[in-house]
Amino acid sequence: AGISFVVNPTRQNAITRGTLAEEEFTGDMDDAAWHLESIQEKGLPVNEINAYNHMAIYLRWCIEHDLMSAEFMERYWEQVQPFMADLSRADLRGFIRDQLKGQLFGALFNKEGAAFAGYYYGEADSPYFPSDIDNYALEYFGSEQYYSDKFQDEAYLFIPFDENYYQAMAKVMEKRFANWQGQSFDEATLEPSDLAEAMMEYLDCECTYFPSMTDDDPIMSAYNYAKRESVKEGFVPVLIKADDEILWECLIMNSNPDSDGEDDFAFDPDKVAEYRKKMLSAPVENSKAVLEEMIGQRKEEAEDDDMDWDEEILGEMEGGYDNRRFSSYWNSDNNMTYPLILAKIPVKNPWEIFAYLPFGGWNECPNTPELMAVAKYWFEQHGAVPAAMSHDELEFLLPAPVPEEKAMDAAVELYGFCPDVIDQGPEDATVGALADVLRQSTVWYFWWD
């Protein structure tokens, strides 16, 4: 199991809070020879000039944003000047091939450009320009084509080199650049705490630790890269609050109940492995029956409280908003993220992550078999995947919002599963208002009191 740390003191701008690092990045970023080798060895049916596509996009963006060194502009002015007249018509691929010997490297850029290159193109970290290119290829071609034998893991070489490609990537690069300039970290969290270390050991899979930061761009880019890789690699990525003692207690209580929750975060790995095996080998409960029982409980509670189910609980489908961002990892006290772990849980199906993260079974929070049953149903119905959690919060990510005609039924299920989303919400919260959120949202948020 590998553990990586997103903050690496030698990495450009990791700890310098958006200012330029002392050391200038002069290293190699990319070499067309690597991509040409793929084309030749795999016999890919593409023109060899395509090996330079993504490099030309990066170079053009940096020229447009005045990130090139004075030496570069002087030395190559004759060749670059015609491009400067109309960059939208510029094809820098031949220039990179013939003048730069097919390479991009830090010395081509001015101080700011080199520092940004070190951050975004120097190391296979997050965010990382080549990974953003791969993500765009997935978005452009769709899953089936992207993972097809035709592309042989090299879909990026097949993207048509046109203005649409450039503009799509320019938008991504602008976001990365703005994040890099404004980013700051809580220095006290740069190294994982003892609890975070224990949590990663408990998860026993590839984990990346993220310190507390003001902009979640590195976190979300890493999550999105992992999501793309997960299809081939066979894991499910989950973002987990790292310094959550109650979450730790819940995990141990469920998977290693004989442990008295030692102060040094000790646990019995054999017992934990046994628990996981047991949960994964048991047949998943009848999802519909589990949800119907939960909804039945809510109806009984409404009756006990003399509340009219249709009028007061369901209400009208109105007053919603769109929710497309995770909120469970934000600390509202300082507007920074909590320290987080991105875990690549080694399971085949999204609902099976709860065998590794059995955080429920207290108050109204469902137990592990119930979590698995409901998550399986929602994945099959809506493509919903559990994506982020703390001890009392759980967020699902969906490929698209629930269609309006199905939103009310889905909202009733969500209320059955987690009554606090409405009962602990604003006074006028209803299932209908929740349905109005669902029809606009790709993130479902749950919170148990």
Regions found by a protein language model. Name each.
Residues 1-9:
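Alpha-helical transmembrane anchor segments and their immediate juxtamembrane flanks
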Residues 17-68, 442-449:
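Short, extreme N-terminal segment that most often corresponds to the first beta-strand
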Residues 28-29, 34-37, 43-44, 155-177:
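Polar/charged low-complexity regulatory segments
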Residues 89-165, 297, 301, 386-421:
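Amphipathic protein-protein interaction modules
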Residues 185-350:
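Extended, low-hydrophobicity segments enriched in charged/polar residues
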Residues 218-222, 365-376, 407-412:
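Well-ordered, non-membrane alpha-helical segments in soluble/globular domains
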Residues 329-377:
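Surface-exposed, low-hydrophobicity interaction/linker segments
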Residues 404-449:
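C-terminal structured domains
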